[in-house]
A protein has these predicted regions:
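Exposed beta-strand/loop interface patches that mediate assembly or binding
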Residues: 1-102
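Low-complexity, small-hydrophobic/phenylalanine-enriched stretches
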Residues: 100, 104-116, 120-122, 126-128, ...
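Histidine-centered metal-binding segments
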Residues: 146-150
Length: 150
């Protein structure tokens, strides 16, 4: 049995939520697990927010006690942030955005700060608008930049 409802409680440790179903006189479900893309060797974690509109699959028993939250759905209040079938897009509450356009092959990350841990290789040209700060040497094909003189 498929139902729609609104998340009213979130348990971050167990990745479960409670959902209120307006079409059932405001009945609130038991704690329901949220379906995730991966949970074993690779793991994904992203819980719905309190107040988020979700779809729930309940067991056929009709008790509304055992079921799973399948995901959130857009509605008149919470509308899609983009309207383009070629884009993968995530916007966080603080304004951070991650966007990939499979038609233009452009990955865009908009954030106050981006931290990359590990080695980074850039193949292609690099344009920097702003200052560059390095705590170590900057090496180019012509030699070691910190020891360069004019």
């Amino acid at each position: 049995m498929i139902r729609r409802g609104i998340v009213v409680a979130v348990d971050e440790k167990t990745a479960r939520v409670r959902v209120q179903m307006p079409d059932l006189d405001g009945l609130v479900s038991n704690w329901l697990p949220v379906v995730h893309h991966k949970t074993q060797k690779d793991k994904a974690y992203w819980l719905p927010d309190i107040g988020e509109y979700v779809v729930v699959a309940f067991d056929e028993e009709g008790e509304h006690s055992d079921g799973y939250v399948l995901g959130a759905i857009y509605n008149d209040k919470d509308t899609p942030p983009v309207a383009n079938k070629d884009k993968f897009f995530v916007r966080f509450e603080d304004g951070t955005e991650i966007e990939y356009d499979r038609k233009t092959h452009i990955l865009r990350v908009k954030a106050q700060t981006v931290i990359i841990e590990g080695n980074v290789n850039v193949i292609g040209n690099v344009d920097v608008i702003g200052n560059v700060h390095a705590t170590g040497s900057i090496i180019d094909e012509g030699g070691n930049t910190p020891h360069h003189t004019h």
